[in-house]
Amino acid sequence: MTVETQLNPTQPVNQQIYRILRRDIVHCLIAPGTPLSEKEVSVRFNVSRQPVREAFIKLAENGLIQIRPQRGSYVNKISMAQVRNGSFIRQAIECAVARRAASMITESQCYQLEQNLHQQRIAIERKQLDDFFELDDNFHQLLTQIADCQLAWDTIENLKATVDRVRYMSFDHVSPPEMLLRQHLDIFSALQKRDGDAVERAMTQHLQEISESVRQIRQENSDWFSEE
C-alpha cells in the first residue's frame, strides 16, 4: 500500500513533489532503474496527476528520470558522463565564486559561515547525514551569496542532481562527513584571510573529491551506473 505524504498547503504542490522525489532519488530511497507511476505518486500525495506530471518533467530536465510516453517513467541510472560534466562545470563556477567571495566577505558573513560549520559538526556528532547533506549545500550557497552571484547557485542546482547521488552514496566510507568538514574549514580559513589563491586551491581540492569517490562507488554498485 502507498503511504500518503502530507504536503504544505501554502506552497506550490508541484514544487513540493519535485523536491521530495528528488531527495528520495538522490538518497537512493528510489533506486536507479525503478519505475515511477504518475498514478502511484498522485495517490501518495493525494493530488491530481497534473502537479505530478510537472514534477516529473523537472526531474527529467535534471537528468534524474526518463519519461517515455505510453511506456511509463523510470529512475535513470547514474550517468558517468553527467557526473564528469557536472563536476567540471561546478568546479569552474565554484572556484571563481570562492575567489570572488574572498575579496568581498564581511565579518557578519564570516559569522554566518561559522554558524553553518558549527551545525555541520553537530550533525556529524549526531550521525544525522541528511542534515549534514543539506548544511553542506547551504555552505556552498552562502558563498555564492557572499560573492553576490546567486545565479551561480541556480546554475549549479540545475546541473548537480546526478553528482548529488554520488555525493550521498559516498558518505558511508569513501568521503566521510568528517573529511568534508575539514575541507570546509580549510575553505573558511582562507576566506577569513581574504586569500583568493588559497581559497581557490582549497575549493579545487574539495570538489575534486567526487572524482575519487565515484570510482569506488561504481565498483561497489556497478548495476546503478551507465556510461551515457
Curated annotation (Swiss-Prot):
Q: Gene3D superfamilies under this entry? A: GntR ligand-binding domain-like, Winged helix-like DNA-binding domain superfamily/Winged helix DNA-binding domain
> InterPro entries in the record, alphabetically?
GntR_C, TF_FadR/GntR_C, Tscrpt_reg_HTH_GntR, WH-like_DNA-bd_sf, WH_DNA-bd_sf
Q: Which keywords accompany this UniProt record? A: DNA-binding, Repressor, Transcription, Transcription regulation
Instruction: Name one molecular function that GO assigns to this entry.
Output: DNA binding
Coiled-coil segments: none
Q: Where is the HTH gntR-type domain?
A: 11-78
Q: What role is this protein assigned? A: Repressor of the rspAB operon. Acts by binding directly to the upstream region of rspA.
The record, for PANTHER family, names: HTH-TYPE TRANSCRIPTIONAL REPRESSOR RSPR (PTHR43537:SF6), TRANSCRIPTIONAL REGULATOR, GNTR FAMILY (PTHR43537)
Q: What is this protein called?
A: HTH-type transcriptional repressor RspR
Question: What species is given as this protein's source?
Answer: Escherichia coli (strain K12)
